[in-house]
Design a protein with these regions (language model features):
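Gly/Pro/Ser/Thr-rich low-complexity, intrinsically disordered segments predominantly at protein N-termini
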Residues: 1-168
Length: 168
């Protein structure tokens, strides 16, 4: 089994799945974007070992966002996509290390992904990174923040809708 497959097997949890589904659903409603989950990105053009990553030629964000109209169903499916998304979202699960996700963010930024979100379900928080690990904003339910704001992509989402079961 390759390193990516081993890593992906360690990720599942109820909180991870809950938040991934909620975020993908909320982003799906934004008509400017196409929302894709668990998409394999072809990254063989850079050496991932420089970021301390074991993966060789693909990375798989939990959620990624592309401009609307970029993709549609195909007769022959694609296993990897070489065009990078605008946004990559990683949701930390109980068996993941924060440093591993931050290393992926460094690789994503080197691949010209505009923003990366680090979602921590147990803390009900989201960090929005813009182009470097040093440039980020934190949003958390515990601080009474009401929205996640990604200024680069002009996205605003309700934190309550991401982390809480709400009646609409």
């Amino acid at each position: 089994m390759n390193d990516l497959a081993e890593t992906e097997q360690k990720m599942g949890s109820l909180n991870h799945s809950f938040v991934q589904t909620r975020l993908a659903g909320l982003l799906f409603n934004d008509e400017r974007f196409t929302t894709l989950v668990e998409l394999s990105l072809e990254v063989s053009q850079i050496d991932l070992s420089q970021f301390g990553l074991k993966a060789k030629d693909e990375l798989k964000p939990d959620i990624c966002l592309y401009p609307k109209g970029k993709f549609c169903l195909r007769r022959r499916d694609l296993l990897r996509i070489s065009e990078m998304p605008l946004l990559a979202i990683e949701i930390i699960s109980p068996r993941q290390y924060l440093d591993d996700i931050l290393a992926k963010f460094e690789a994503y930024f080197a691949l010209d992904i505009k923003t990366c979100w680090l979602v921590t379900p147990v803390l009900e928080s989201i960090n929005v990174y813009s182009q470097t690990l040093d440039n980020f904003k934190s949003f958390a339910v515990s601080r009474d923040d009401t929205e996640i704001i990604d200024e680069i992509l002009n996205i605003r989402l309700s934190l309550q809708q991401v982390f809480k079961e709400t009646n609409v």
